[in-house]
Regions:
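Intrinsic low-complexity, intrinsically disordered or marginally ordered coil/linker segments
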Residues: 1-83
């Protein structure tokens, strides 16, 4: 059984971007609200969607944000390479 993976991309006041992946039992808005609150509103959601075959696609209905496609995919790959 494959688990569907979602993501939200955040931007800070300096313009730096961060991508967070999470399982499908959470909504995009639940994850984003938690991150924004924990960061004292330092981070703001700018895109969201799903990860399919290593690519960022789709949209977040609960956040009313679309995937930025290749831009989010490159950020995801960069994040994974930093581990």
């Amino acid at each position: 059984m494959d688990i569907e993976i979602k993501y939200v991309t955040f931007k800070d006041f300096r313009g730096d971007e961060y991508i967070i992946t999470f399982p499908s039992y959470m909504t995009h808005s639940e994850l984003a609200e938690s991150v924004v609150e924990l960061s004292d509103e330092f981070l703001k959601p700018i895109s969201g969607g799903f990860i399919e075959n290593g690519e960022c696609v789709g949209e977040s209905i609960s956040l009313n944000l679309k995937s930025r496609g290749e831009q989010d995919t490159l950020l995801l790959k960069k994040m994974r390479n930093q581990r």
